Amino acid sequence: MKKLTYRKIQSFQAIITVLVIFASFYLEYAAGLQPCPLCLMQRVCVFILLGLMGVSLGTVKKAHIVSLIQFQVACAGLYFSLRQLWLQSLPSDQAPACMPGLDVLIQYFPWQTVAKALFWGAGDCAEVTWTMFGVSMPGWAAMYFLSMAIMGLFLFFRTRTIN
């Protein structure tokens, strides 16, 4: 059996992450789904993860630190996706009120309101607009972030004794 190395694992994760990014842009531009604030935060986490994987492919030095940061970013993405799943599970009368688009929020509202919408979500985050095999988009995102967090933690413990 071939040995799984740090770079092979990170390369595989980078390929999965690129596929997730392509899927998110496909759903936005080809399928016409507008991302809610929590979706945007999840996308930011995916881009940060891809950047970390790119850094880790360049050098194996400090791989344990990169893996720990990868774990933390994946946990942040997991928070955003679980928050959105929770909002989607609320009855319609308990869901938060819809807010204007992010561009309008940034232009006309104070930064505290923008930050609250980005970190806590809004009414449009509670809408289920797309499912695959009965699982909504934040459910798939939660599975992705959970797998990235587990692999980040695994790589952290595996590489901290090497470096």
Swiss-Prot record:
One of its GO terms (molecular function) is protein-disulfide reductase activity. Pfam families: DsbB (PF02600). Residues 27-44, 83-139 are periplasmic. It is a multi-pass membrane protein. One of its GO terms (biological process) is protein folding. Keywords: Cell inner membrane, Cell membrane, Chaperone, Disulfide bond, Electron transport, Membrane, Oxidoreductase, Redox-active center, Transmembrane, Transmembrane helix, Transport. InterPro entries: DiS_bond_form_DsbB/BdbC, Disulphide_bond_form_DsbB, DsbB, DsbB-like_sf. It is found in: Cell inner membrane. Disulfide bonds join C36-C39, C98-C125. This is Disulfide bond formation protein B. The gene is dsbB. Residues 1-9, 59-64, 159-163 are cytoplasmic.
